Regions:
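Boundary at the C-terminal end of the N-terminal hydrophobic targeting segment
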Residues: 22-27
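A conserved acidic, glycine/proline-rich C-terminal tail/linker
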Residues: 38-39, 282-364
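N-terminal secretory signal peptides that target proteins for export/translocation
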Residues: 1-4
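Active-site microenvironments in enzyme catalytic cores
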Residues: 29-60, 69-72, 78-271, 280-281, ...
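Bacterial N-terminal signal peptides
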Residues: 11-20
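Structural motif
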Residues: 177, 312-314, 320, 368, ...
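N-terminal export leaders
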Residues: 6-9
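Conserved glycine-rich phosphate/nucleotide-binding loop
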Residues: 344-392
């Protein structure tokens, strides 16, 4: 039986949810998301947080303690050289040092050197399975007509701060900027969460709204079904250049600003303080449901986590603000979906709608440039490209 109007409207709207000189930003972000002003990056105050970066030199990955930023480079200490550990996971190196030792190193600055921005690699975790929150900002929930935040899995390798994403024919590629988090240990309980070092980084959550339209569970939107298929893939999860470990994670998150620019025009601007579910709540719900809940993905069902724990190879995507491309379908489409006699008839309506949206070219197109940025977490630059030709 086709869903009723209220359910269908929510179904259509929720698709959108899942969606460098130092100048500190003190004011709350403006609601004028179409402005062109850019939130410039600054280093998180060293008395409240440590900022880490990584570079690859040959086969070795070096983990750095960042001391200063400029237009062309960062100034940092090589913690890998100091510890003798060259790990792809920054936390392996960071955990060789106490907070007090890091403070002393930052104060002394002995051995600090410059590293060019283009040499910085992504600081995301090395796994594929991540935890994502949908409609976790009130303004975004308002624009898509969904009051409650919900969770779903995202299956993607973490990319770096300079990436590409393919926008093929018929795809509706949308952008979302998010605050991401990862941990220095496996999280099996809230006690583990409270004790863990928490690292924050800016990330992108690209999605194909066409896939989401086809896969969405219209009867139960907050099940999250349809989101893993639409948001997973090799180029859907770019990560920023900085992993920031604060002493007070709640205060730090409350000061974060995130935004998206497309071809220089600001599309999204949000204050992380406005999240509905904070990081601890997301962890709690993930652990509580780990043994019982599954989500649809590639015509099967998958859990959020494979074991009853959040591993060090997983990240948490905490949601996005308003300003994504997707908008509620037009009245005729909604009526047609409501009147469809069965799922096959609904699919016909959905495919017609997807073709119409693709023809408008309002979603990301080849040659577009997307910039995700944050005041303390750095920036990600993504170039949208066409799929390779078959004759190449």
């Amino acid at each position: 039986m086709p869903p009723n109007r209220r359910t269908l409207s929510a179904a259509c709207l929720v698709l959108a949810s899942m969606t460098l000189p130092a100048v500190t930003i003190h004011a709350a972000p403006s609601t004028n998301t179409r402005a062109t002003a850019v939130t410039v990056a600054t280093l998180a105050p060293l008395d409240r947080a440590h900022t880490f970066a990584q570079v690859r030199e040959g086969d070795a990955v070096r983990t750095l303690l960042v001391l200063a930023l400029s237009d062309k480079n960062i100034t940092a200490l090589d913690l890998s050289a100091l510890s003798g550990l060259y790990s792809t996971d920054a936390f392996d190196v960071i955990n060789r040092f106490s907070t007090a030792q890091l403070n002393d190193l930052a104060s002394a600055k002995r051995g600090a050197r410059a590293y060019a921005w283009p040499d910085l690699i992504g600081v995301g975790p090395r796994g594929l399975a991540h935890i994502a929150a949908g409609t976790n900002y009130p303004a975004h929930g308002d624009e898509v007509g969904v009051a409650d935040a919900f969770l779903f899995p995202k299956i993607s390798p973490a990319g770096g701060p300079r990436t590409t994403i393919v926008a093929g024919p018929g795809a509706l590629i949308d952008y979302e900027v998010e605050v991401c988090a990862r941990f220095d240990r496996e999280i099996r309980s809230l006690h583990d969460f409270d004790e863990a070092r928490k690292g924050f980084f800016v990330c992108g959550d690209f999605s194909d709204r066409a896939t989401m339209m086809r896969k969405l569970n219209l009867k139960e939107i907050t099940s999250g079904d349809g989101f893993p298929d639409a948001k997973s893939g090799p180029d859907r999860f770019p990560s920023g250049p900085f992993l920031v470990v604060p002493t007070d994670w709640k205060r730090f998150v409350s000061e974060l600003v995130i935004e998206t620019h497309v071809n220089g025009e600001r599309r999204q601007l949000a204050a992380a303080a406005h999240m509905i579910k904070d990081l601890r709540t997301i962890v709690q719900e993930t652990l509580e449901d780990a043994a019982t809940r599954t989500w649809s993905y590639q015509d099967g069902r998958i859990p959020m986590v494979r074991r009853l724990a959040i591993g060090t190879d997983s990240a948490i995507l905490t949601g996005t603000g308003d300003g994504v491309v997707f908008q509620e379908p037009d009245t005729d489409t909604v009526k047609a979906l409501m009147g469809a006699k069965d799922r096959a008839a609904q699919i016909v309506v959905i495919e017609r709608y997807i073709a119409s949206e693709a023809a408008k070219r309002t979603y990301l197109q080849p040659a577009d440039r997307v910039r995700y940025s944050s005041n303390y977490l750095g920036a990600i630059d993504t170039r949208v490209i066409a799929p390779p030709r078959n004759d190449q």
